Design a protein with these regions (language model features):
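Glycine-centered secondary-structure boundary/capping sites
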Residues: 60-64, 146, 175-177, 249-254
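Serine/threonine-rich low-complexity intrinsically disordered regions
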Residues: 21, 36, 44, 79-84, ...
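Alpha/beta catalytic cores of nucleotide-metabolism and tRNA/nucleoside-modifying enzymes
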Residues: 1-32, 94, 212-223, 244-436
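Context-gated lysine
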Residues: 25, 36, 57, 66, ...
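Sequence-level detector for tyrosine residue identity
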Residues: 3-5, 74, 93-96, 101-106, ...
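Glycine/Thr-rich beta-alpha phosphate-binding loop at enzyme active sites
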Residues: 123-127, 151-244, 253-284
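Non-catalytic, usually N-terminal nucleic-acid engagement modules in DNA/RNA processing proteins
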Residues: 1-147, 380, 384, 393-396, ...
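Hydrophobic, Leu/Ile/Phe/Ala-enriched alpha-helical segments that form helix-helix packing faces
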Residues: 92-100, 134-146, 170-175, 209-218, ...
């Protein structure tokens, strides 16, 4: 499981960007900066393209990292772009997709799930047509340059029944199994807050994607799945588990690579004076109350230079004395480090407790939850700041739902059963239907 840093959100990040990419290697940079203007077009795409090249030159190339490009479709969802400009949006994306493939390692499909502003667009015909046009454009470019097949991620949407049906039909009707090697799951930003669910909502879609991969032209190629915009510890624990479980399924077929992106580590560091800091040392998770308490050796390992070390020490001194930081983002790289250490810890725990085998041995969700509950009891005693009551409940609810899909997967992968399970999941999530 890999975390992808979301770049480009703040101006003049400078050394902070490099301090982060030295850890993550990879960074996600969006085209949104060239698409939210009233007069957006090829000229504004040229500017954001130059920004991405410059970011890559300064922050990913020096560390042997990679750029992932987000399509900027969020501008459409938010209403910065109206339906009358869809073709211009598709054309701008196409120019970047076709011409900048040596700059980016991966790129996400241009998706238009609905519009928060232009409600007249939110009907099945218009949404399907817009996304069909976008995907047909991408397919045409891929056919001209087969290198792009390995770089292209198809973004799935699923939180409304009509939406999932459309994306499923797009995949089938456009024969995307011949073109799509990599998959991503979108629509999850703010989903828990909007619905009140505690469990991780992406289990069903992950199994659906895995099944699509096994019926595609790319069986045997690495199975890559990206989760857009997740950040909670319980969600990341589940991604780490799914990666291990799917690798077990595909042991004789291919490798599995899962990843996620989030702006949360940087935002949390800006907004909160006290957030726990984690460091995994010799298999033990060290927990500090805040970045102010961490050993100087960790400061040196994260900072990009002796000068940066001094800047950080001065910021820690300001924080300790109740003064305002000179740069609100100063501790962002430290929170990224902390979250990466927590991710490693989750992966270690999944192996230590052999949770994949626990899933495989369980003959019912009740038996599985009993076993998982015992593990979580131990972990909450040893690491109460990580495995809080809320996190434990979320993990248990998520594993219960994962068992249903595991049972489906190992017992024939019946398409009719999958459809029924998927509709049950969507109804359970309960996101308001916005599509007529």
């Amino acid at each position: 499981m890999n975390y992808v840093y979301v770049a480009g959100g703040q101006q003049n990040q400078g050394v902070l960007d490099l301090a982060i990419t030295r850890q993550t290697k990879n960074a996600l940079h969006s085209l949104v900066g060239g698409l939210k203007q009233a007069d957006f077009g090829l000229h504004t795409i040229e500017q954001v393209t130059a920004d991405i090249r410059q970011f890559s030159k300064l922050n990913t190339v020096p560390v042997g990292g990679k750029i992932l490009t987000d399509s900027g479709g969020y501008s459409f969802l938010r209403g910065d772009i109206g339906p009358s400009l869809i073709q211009m949006l598709i054309d701008c994306y196409a120019v970047y997709f076709e011409s900048e493939y040596e700059t980016y390692e991966y790129i996400f499909s241009l998706d238009m799930p609905y519009s928060e502003k232009y409600h007249g667009f939110n009907n099945k015909n218009d949404i399907y047509s817009a996304n069909e046009r976008s995907l047909k454009s991408a397919i045409g470019i891929i056919e001209l340059n087969q290198v792009l097949q390995a770089k292209y991620y198809f973004v799935w949407h699923f939180k409304m029944a009509s939406q999932f049906s459309m994306w499923n039909n797009l995949y089938k009707n456009l024969d995307l199994g011949r073109y799509v090697r990599n998959h991503a799951i979108g629509g999850m930003v703010g989903l828990k807050r909007a619905t009140g669910i505690r469990y991780s909502p992406f289990t069903a879609m992950s199994f659906h994607v895995l099944n699509s991969y096994l019926n595609s032209s790319f069986v045997g190629k690495e199975f890559r799945l990206h989760f857009l915009g997740i950040y909670s510890p319980q969600d990341r624990f589940h991604v780490a588990f799914l990666e291990a479980l799917f690798q077990e399924y595909l042991a004789d077929i291919s490798t599995v690579a899962m990843s996620y992106d989030s702006i949360n580590p940087m935002q949390a560091a800006r907004m909160n004076k006290k957030i726990p800091f984690f460091n995994l040392k010799d298999g033990i998770l060290e927990v500090y109350n805040s970045v102010n308490e961490i050993p100087i050796s960790i400061v040196h390992s994260i900072a990009t230079s002796p000068e940066h070390v001094q800047v950080i020490l001065e910021e820690i001194d300001r924080r300790n004395n109740g003064f305002r930081l000179q740069n609100a983002g100063s501790f962002g790289p430290f929170n990224v480090y902390s979250n990466l250490e927590l991710d490693k810890f989750f992966e270690m725990l999944i192996k230590k407790y052999d949770l994949v085998s626990v899933m495989k041995r369980s003959t019912s969700p009740t038996g599985l939850i009993s076993c998982i509950g015992k593990v979580l009891d131990d972990l909450s005693r040893d690491y109460p700041q990580v495995f809080t009551r809320s996190v434990q409940q979320s993990i248990q609810q998520t594993f219960e739902r994962a068992w249903r899909w595991h049972n489906w997967f190992v017992n024939g992968r019946n398409p009719q059963v999958a459809e029924e399970l998927m509709l049950t999941v969507i109804n359970e999530i309960g996101f308001p239907n916005m599509i007529c």
